[in-house]
Amino acid sequence: MKRPARSIILCGIKHCGKSTQGKRLAAALGLDFYDTDDLILEQCGMDARAIYKSQGKDAFMAAELKACEYLRDTLQAKGSQGQEAAAAKCAVIATGGGICQNEPAIAILKKLGTIVYLEVPEITAAGRIVREARFLPDGTIQNLPAYIANKNPADQKEVRAIFHDFYMERTKKYRSLADITVQAQGSRSENTKKILSELGLD
């Protein structure tokens, strides 16, 4: 199998399969795998959702940018060592669902590699969010993404309505910044093959 000349950066909304596909691609191509959400947890001692909820959007975006700066510096350092420098500079990177709003972070990632947008149907993504949520007897809903929870939905119907507006806005944004858009509607193995094919690595 061919090796990429640049890193592969996976983006898309929550639950589109970025981390799953990232690990599969890294294994198939023999590359290191990084997840910006994991880096945020390692660097800040709390996960991305907790930072957003307790410290706000600006603090979260700063943490996300710091993770991308770490990736840039790490991959550049690897690329300066030994005969396999070019290969070492390449990795597979899964990003957080809101990376499209973080322009400084996107600017770094675009210099590192190819931005691949994993697009899933709205009904699929909404269904995953609803399944993950906890609808309590007192009417409260737990474990929702912040952008939904902040609008205080009363029931599943309102959750889906809020998500619809979000999905349309994010889809437009991701399509505009991505180098490649992949319709990730198949099985895990099918989606991996699609990504490799779109990248010319099959």
Model-derived regions: residue spans:
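NTP-dependent small-molecule kinase module
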Residues: 2-8, 24, 28, 90, ...
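P-loop (Walker A) phosphate-binding loop of NTP-binding proteins
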Residues: 13
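ATP-binding Walker
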Residues: 16
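Walker A/P-loop
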Residues: 19
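Post-Walker A helix-loop "phosphate-sensing" segment adjacent to the P-loop in P-loop NTPases
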Residues: 27-36
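ATP-dependent small-molecule kinase phosphotransfer cores
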Residues: 38-110, 141-142, 147-152
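Short glycine-rich anion-binding loops that position phosphate/pyrophosphate groups of nucleotides
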Residues: 96-99, 121-123, 187
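A glycine- and Lys/Arg-enriched "phosphate-lid" helix/loop adjacent to the NTP-binding pocket
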Residues: 114-171
